[in-house]
């Protein structure tokens, strides 16, 4: 497949998403085409990315204008301290609002860099070059930035749209399979909230996508971006329909926080568990029918993806999981807000449940 270009139109910003293979040598060309100019540029690069994969970007940018900050990307480093390190560099080097910050890394790097860009002098040009499957299909699009705290995930942040997103699928070949599965969690989520066609494509081709086979991986990325773009354009600040993008995430964020963001469960795996848990909760509350639940569960089983929360948690974790769900940013009453499924491709988001209902449900799931 050739170069794919999408245009995202939100109230605050219009920007392009460029998807292709081995396109980093054209970064400066893409910047010029999108009227992104600057005197200085700070690259925030995930230190875990092989250096040979970013050398084309460095060669492409104007000499003398670039500073580099290597960031040790992890959920534990997704915090205000890391944001402060970036903004301190910008201040020391006398950056101004006409300059640019470019993130090269996965979702964590993009979230931290984007938040730093949004707060520096109330807004610095921000270009996102996502390097993981998860960030290419989800977190790089839509303007959500932020950091974790001891009270929960992404509780401090901002909506700040990038000026440009450049997704080079060549990065994906360097990922361990577990990181590819991590991204597949968000692809699966998108397929369940927007019609049935994409889910059936995944159900048929999921193994090829996880194996990064062409053209299946490119199609999955393209379709995920189209779904995310459509939702973000309709509701930039998550006041309504954008909440459907949180399908599975209320459970997922609580699972991650309960494990203190340990390597036992990465974000995408938590999302897959959260999707399964939300689908089962939908079934048991007579919102989703059994046939469609079994289609979803069967798909997870066929791909050997995480399905059962009792393999990661025990009953002793129940109160902690509930406490993090209580702190979820989508809640605006004493009840817990959940995005559930009516059918594959048809989510419902204006649903609230008392803690007792969720407690009883999780208790049964944890003691199976």
UniProtKB/Swiss-Prot annotation:
Residues annotated for Zn(2+) binding in this entry: 186, 249, 267
Residues bound to NAD(+): 131-132, 144, 153
Keywords: Amino-acid biosynthesis, Aromatic amino acid biosynthesis, Cobalt, Cytoplasm, Lyase, Metal-binding, NAD, Nucleotide-binding, Zinc
Catalytic activity: 7-phospho-2-dehydro-3-deoxy-D-arabino-heptonate = 3-dehydroquinate + phosphate
Enzyme class: lyase
Pathway: Metabolic intermediate biosynthesis; chorismate biosynthesis; chorismate from D-erythrose 4-phosphate and phosphoenolpyruvate: step 2/7
Cofactor dependence: Co(2+); Zn(2+); NAD(+)
Function of the protein: Catalyzes the conversion of 3-deoxy-D-arabino-heptulosonate 7-phosphate (DAHP) to dehydroquinate (DHQ).
EC number: 4.2.3.4
Any Pfam family the entry gives: DHQS_C
Cofactor remark from the record: Binds 1 divalent metal cation per subunit. Can use either Co(2+) or Zn(2+).
Protein name (database record): 3-dehydroquinate synthase
UniProt superkingdom: Bacteria
């Amino acid at each position: 497949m050739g170069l794919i270009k999408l245009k995202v139109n939100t109230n605050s910003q219009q920007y392009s998403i460029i998807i292709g293979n081995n396109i980093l040598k054209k970064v400066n060309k893409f910047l010029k085409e999108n009227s992104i100019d600057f005197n200085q540029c700070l690259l925030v690069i995930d230190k875990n990315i092989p250096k040979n994969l970013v050398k084309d970007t460095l060669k492409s940018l104007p000499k003398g204008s670039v500073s580099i900050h290597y960031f040790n990307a992890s959920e534990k480093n997704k915090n205000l301290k890391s944001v402060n390190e970036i903004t301190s560099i910008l201040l020391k080097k006398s950056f101004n609002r006409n300059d640019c910050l470019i993130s090269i890394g996965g979702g964590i790097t993009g979230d931290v860099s984007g938040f730093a860009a949004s707060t520096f002098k109330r807004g610095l040009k921000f270009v996102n070059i996502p390097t993981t499957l998860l960030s290419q299909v989800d977190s790089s699009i839509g303007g959500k930035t932020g950091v974790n705290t001891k009270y929960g995930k992404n509780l401090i942040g901002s909506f700040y749209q990038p000026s440009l997103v450049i997704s080079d699928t060549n990065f994906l070949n360097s990922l361990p399979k577990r990181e590819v599965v991590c991204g597949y969690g968000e692809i699966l989520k998108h397929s369940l909230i927007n019609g049935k066609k994409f889910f059936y494509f995944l159900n048929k081709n999921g193994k090829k996508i996880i194996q990064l086979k062409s053209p299946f991986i490119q199609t999955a990325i393209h379709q995920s971006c189209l779904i995310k773009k459509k939702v973000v354009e309709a509701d930039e600040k998550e006041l309504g329909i954008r909440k459907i993008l949180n399908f599975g995430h209320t459970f997922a964020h609580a699972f991650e926080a309960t494990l203190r963001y340990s390597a036992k469960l990465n974000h995408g795996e938590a999302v897959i568990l959260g999707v399964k848990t939300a689908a089962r909760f939908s079934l048991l509350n007579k919102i989703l029918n059994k046939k469609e639940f079994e289609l979803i569960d069967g798909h997870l089983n066929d791909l050997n993806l995480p399905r059962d929360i009792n393999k990661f948690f025990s009953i002793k974790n129940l109160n902690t999981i509930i406490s993090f769900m209580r702190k979820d940013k989508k809640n605006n009453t004493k009840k817990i807000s959940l995005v559930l499924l009516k059918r594959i491709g048809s989510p419902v988001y204006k649903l609230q449940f008392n803690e007792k209902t969720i407690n009883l449900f999780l208790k049964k799931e944890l003691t199976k």
